[in-house]
Amino acid sequence: MAESVFAERIVQNLLDTDFYKLTMMQAVLHNYPNAEVEWEFRCRNAEDLRPYLAEIRYQIERLAEVEVTADQLAFLERIPFMKPDFIRFLSLFRFNLRYVHTGIEDGQLAIRLRGPWLHVILFEVPLLAIVSEVRNRYRYREVVLEQVGEQLYRKLDWLSAQASSEELAEFQVADFGTRRRFSYRTQEEVVHILKRDFPGRFVGTSNVHLAREYDLKPIGTMAHEWLMAHQQLGPRLVDSQQAALDCWVREYRGQLGIALTDCITMDAFLDDFDLYFAKLFDGLRHDSGDPLAWAEKAIAHYRRLGIDPLSKTLVFSDGLDMPKALQLFRALRGKINVSFGIGTNLTCDIPGVEPMNIVLKMTACNGHPVAKISDAPGKTQCRDENFVAYLRHVFNVPA
């Protein structure tokens, strides 16, 4: 009998999240425990999600029952940069549902988070996974686990046929597919197959629970929210990116050294990414805009600073599939180290299934707006157009 891809309970443990949520949470605990934030859900492809509201609410309510286990805490304790006070905090942490607000606004599903950053930070990934899986249960209930494996093996066979053994030995891929996965079981099957049969170098997964289950490295450093929040955490707006990077350096002392570049655009980021940061951080992550043009800018920036690009790593994570990743790998091989985080194309690529394009983004910090401009116009998210205009002015970003 074919095995279903759905489980009755969507999020079953606290570690079923992206690793960078925990790394940022620890930094928030140590540096901004009293910061207040607001988040807002958006479905970018305007799909009507109202019919699923009751089931989404039910699954959110079940998050309140989730708590970390002793074995999970022991796994985190083995990570050198996870501090004892943060581990103790996690042992006491529970999802507090008073910070989550769901309903219908302007004819669309609305989800908002409002509360202490420290206590709402872990909601983002489970909420997105819940919305995605609930919707998929209704629309694609006939999908079975075998289809997931068949589709993935087609990609692995293609890669084996296209790339030489020398290329495959250097071709690094990680699973970044938690938030928009078809279902939890789908992601688990993908990670299981990649660990066993990926022809290149499968370097890990962003999902902490699956990293623990499959003895993989949990992958991730910071997300946009880290840089966005600093727009309202005290420093002058023009200094906010450097303040975010500096706080990260002080927190992790050389660990977790991949910086995200597109909160306000790559050009604005590089203006702030001086010799100090370029030496301290191991590399950069691309998440919007033309990836090759972005990479060439990064390489040129390192060279201008007198840094050998081959001592640094570029991580690509924007809408990748195997052909795009291989194309980038070949274009940049010998110029700089590269690694690829593939998400939706691994965990929600099933024939006949349309993946969701959903986000849950921070919109305010300490009662004031924050924004992401990015290197792709469609990824800008902020209700306050005046603040976006001011942000563009401060960082010299054309409208």
Swiss-Prot record:
Matching Pfam families? NAPRTase, NAPRTase_N
Q: Please list the reactions this protein catalyses.
A: nicotinate + 5-phospho-alpha-D-ribose 1-diphosphate + ATP + H2O = nicotinate beta-D-ribonucleotide + ADP + phosphate + diphosphate
Query: So, what pathway does this thing act in?
Result: Cofactor biosynthesis; NAD(+) biosynthesis; nicotinate D-ribonucleotide from nicotinate: step 1/1
Q: Which InterPro entries match?
A: N/Namide_PRibTrfase, NAPRTase_N, Nic_PRibTrfase, Nic_PRibTrfase-Fam, Nicotinate_pribotase-like_C
Q: What SUPFAM superfamilies does the record tag this protein with?
A: Nicotinate/Quinolinate PRTase C-terminal domain-like, Nicotinate/Quinolinate PRTase N-terminal domain-like
Q: Work out whether the entry's keyword set contains Ligase.
A: yes
UniProt keywords, alphabetically: Ligase, Phosphoprotein, Pyridine nucleotide biosynthesis
Q: How is it modified after translation?
A: Transiently phosphorylated on a His residue during the reaction cycle. Phosphorylation strongly increases the affinity for substrates and increases the rate of nicotinate D-ribonucleotide production. Dephosphorylation regenerates the low-affinity form of the enzyme, leading to product release.
GO BP terms: namely: NAD biosynthetic process via the salvage pathway
Q: Name one GO molecular function term.
A: nicotinate phosphoribosyltransferase activity
Q: Would the keyword Ligase turn up in this protein's UniProt record? A: yes
The EC designation for this entry is: 6.3.4.21
Listed under GO cellular component are:
cytosol
Q: Which domain of life is it from?
A: Bacteria
What family classification does the UniProt entry report for this protein?
A: Belongs to the NAPRTase family.
Q: What does this protein do?
A: Catalyzes the synthesis of beta-nicotinate D-ribonucleotide from nicotinate and 5-phospho-D-ribose 1-phosphate at the expense of ATP.
* Protein's name according to its UniProt entry: Nicotinate phosphoribosyltransferase 1
